Amino acid sequence: MAYLKKSLFLVLFLGLVSLSICEEEKREEENEEEQEDDDQSEEKRGFLDVITHVGKAVGKAALNAVTEMVNQAEQ
């Protein structure tokens, strides 16, 4: 009976250890995925910021050009 108890405790202990290791690996994978998602969203945000700044610059240049044309037409 004692031999059976020891075997049972050993099996339970090894099962808990392997479960713990699997959960730790799963957490690490989730953290890596979250980090990759964060990196991708930062890249998208940076790209959108560049597009926004370029759009503003183009809009200002076009507005200045139209204003100059109107001023020249009035003279």
Curated annotation (Swiss-Prot):
It is found in: Secreted. GO terms for cellular component: extracellular region. The keyword Cell cycle does not apply. Expressed by the skin glands. Residues 1-22 form the signal peptide. Residues 24-44 are annotated as: Disordered. The keyword Signal applies. Its main location: secreted. GO terms for biological process: defense response. Residues 23-43 form a propeptide. Has antimicrobial activity. Belongs to the frog skin active peptide (FSAP) family. Cruzioseptin subfamily. This is Cruzioseptin-6.
